[in-house]
UniProtKB/Swiss-Prot annotation:
GO terms for cellular component: membrane. Residues 112-147 are annotated as: Disordered. It comes from Pongo abelii (Sumatran orangutan). This is Transmembrane protein 252. The chain crosses the membrane at residues 8-28, 40-60.
Length: 170
């Protein structure tokens, strides 16, 4: 009976808090229409009180759920401890399997410096802005075309495309 009464009181607190917030919002909108100071005072009292009641109802329902589930968790823990200690099953790796990931990384770390020293070839040159391969002989790339040249080439291509379209239509 006590559990049911607590549930009803919790639901009532949530409902009352929500209704008080809604009523306060209604009084604020009604007060701005009819210019009534009494409704504004009631609204500014109902809004914070409604929020406090609503939040207390939320926390109260959470507390009730935790205390109910705490009993279930205690029961499960007692059953688990009554069975005794858990045995953890492990699997040993046979020698014919490849090495573990961590072991393979250690082997690669040891072999990489030796390979670099043995080759003696420097890495290729790259540009500062990208990762394109840059030839050692061509140290100065050609300059981009001027604005007038690029516009002129665009106009020429547009005119040729337009002429092709007109030729296809006729």
């Amino acid at each position: 009976m006590q559990n049911r009464t607590g549930l009803i009181l919790c639901a009532l607190a949530l409902l009352m808090g929500f209704l008080m917030v809604c009523l306060g919002a209604f009084f604020i909108s009604w007060g701005s229409i009819f210019d009534c100071q009494g409704s504004l005072i009631a609204a500014y009292l109902l809004l914070p009180l409604g929020f406090v009641i609503l939040l207390s109802g939320i926390f109260w329902s959470n507390y009730r759920q935790v205390t109910e589930s705490k009993g279930v968790l205690r029961h499960m823990l007692r059953q688990h401890l009554a069975h005794g200690a858990l045995s953890v099953a492990t699997v040993d790796r046979p020698d014919f399997y490849p090495p573990a990931y961590e072991e393979s990384l250690e082997v690669e770390k040891q072999s990489c410096p030796a390979e670099r020293e043995a080759s003696g070839i420097p890495p290729p040159l790259y540009t500062e802005t990208g990762l394109e391969f840059q030839d050692g002989n061509d140290s100065h790339p050609e300059a981009p075309p001027s604005y007038r040249e690029s516009i002129a080439s665009l106009v020429v291509t547009a005119i040729s495309e337009d002429a092709q379209r007109r030729g296809q239509e006729c």
